[in-house]
Structures are given as C-alpha cells and as structure tokens.
C-alpha cells in the first residue's frame, strides 16, 4: 500500500542519514546523505542516472523526489530549486553517461525541445559536477569521438551488457559535452555543460579496493 511504501521509505531515509553521520570523521572521511534518481526509459536507452547529494544531514526533506513523481530531469531540478528556497542545499551528479545512448548531454531537453536559456540555467544551478570515471568505465571520451587521441580508449566500455556495440556515442561523453556547451555559448545560449568532474567507485558502500586483483563492488 501507499502507507507501507511511505513507511519503508522513511525507515530507509533515517538509516541513510544515520550511516552518513556515524561514518563522518572530519579531515579523514567525509560523508553525505543522498540517493539515486533515475529517469531511464529502458535499461540502455536514455540510461540516465543521477546521484542527488544533500549538503548536510540536519535538514533533509521528509519526501524526496523520485521517478514516480516524474522521469523528466528538469522536474527534479525544479524540486531542487524549491527546497533550496527553503534552505535545503543539494546538487545532482549525472553518472554512467557513457551508456546513456546520447541522452546525458543532448542538445535537446528530455521532451525533445531545443536546449534554451531556462534549461541551461536550471542545469547550471543544480548539476555543477559530472562523474567522469567509475566501475562501468570512463566517460571522458571514446576513440570514435577523439580519433587523434591515442589514449581515448582508456577504460571505455565496448558494449552494453547483452549488446554487441555501443550506440549514440555523441552526447554520452564529457569532452563532447564541453564542445557542445561551447557551441551553445557561441549561439548566445548559456553553456549548460560548464561542469567540474569527479571519479566514483559505484560500489554504493563508500569504499573500494586498492588493486585490480581485489576489486569488489
């Protein structure tokens, strides 16, 4: 039931907050409370995942925004703008862009319309970072996109699980996004892809291994 679902969500939220608070060691290990939002349509078609991270654990909304509210990332940004006005600071970090099928850094919005100033500013406010590498490979660039770069094949996925080849490489990689952003800026639209980069493990446990031989996830 809806009541049972809400109760389970509340328990999970409290457990997440407690885990972040318990593990936090200033100057040694920094933790944040957050969750994963997905607007994926199919498994590897518009595979869009974002990690939503809250600035602190003392002021987190009772109900978080999920794909049940909307699969449109702009609606997530609207929600983040709304809670920011109430004093709740957060950011969203797109990850796994390398298997997004070109959707992560598209020149169109989720509904197919062209990127405009409203879209660009909302994205800039809410997504200042993008994940460039993790266990599923790097999202910097691909040999087909950077043909003169002999290192462009570093840790890139060659196919999706269950598929023979990757498709729609343009719009899936960070370097390509930077170029697209500069193109939009040249056309007089704010650059929505002016972001910094992070690396992650995607282990979902805040840990990883030191060597490839003992890698775990």
Predicted regions, residues:
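Single conserved hydrophobic/aromatic residue that forms the stacking wall/gate
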Residues: 1-8, 12
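A conserved hydrophobic secondary-structure block that centers on an alpha-helix together
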Residues: 13, 21-25, 38, 59-61
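A structural signal for short coil/turn segments at secondary-structure junctions
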Residues: 24-27, 87
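Glycine-rich, aromatic-flanked loop segments that form ligand/cofactor-binding clefts
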Residues: 28-39
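General beta-strand structural signal in soluble alpha/beta enzymes
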Residues: 32-33, 92-94
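Charged catalytic cores and adjacent phosphate/nucleic-acid-binding surfaces used
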Residues: 39-90, 97-217
């Amino acid at each position: 039931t809806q009541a049972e679902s809400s109760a389970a969500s509340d328990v999970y939220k409290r457990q997440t907050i407690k885990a972040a608070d318990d593990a936090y060691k200033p100057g040694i290990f920094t933790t944040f409370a957050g969750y994963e939002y997905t607007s994926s349509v199919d498994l590897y078609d518009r595979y869009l995942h974002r990690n939503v991270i809250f600035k602190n654990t003392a002021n987190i909304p009772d109900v978080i925004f999920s794909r049940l509210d909307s699969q449109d990332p702009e609606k997530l940004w609207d929600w983040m703008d709304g809670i920011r006005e109430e004093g709740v600071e957060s950011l969203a970090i797109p990850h796994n862009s390398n298997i997004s099928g070109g959707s992560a850094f598209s020149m169109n919005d989720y509904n197919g319309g062209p990127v405009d100033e409203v879209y660009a500013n909302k994205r800039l406010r809410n997504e200042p970072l993008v994940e460039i590498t993790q266990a599923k490979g790097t999202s910097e660039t691909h040999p087909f996109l950077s043909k003169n770069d002999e290192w462009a094949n570093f840790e890139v996925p060659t196919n999706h699980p269950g598929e023979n080849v990757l498709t729609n490489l343009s719009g899936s990689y960070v370097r390509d996004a930077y170029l697209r952003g500069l193109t939009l800026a040249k056309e007089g639209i704010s650059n929505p892809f002016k972001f910094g980069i992070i690396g992650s493990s995607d282990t979902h446990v805040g840990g990883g291994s030191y060597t490839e031989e003992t890698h775990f996830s």
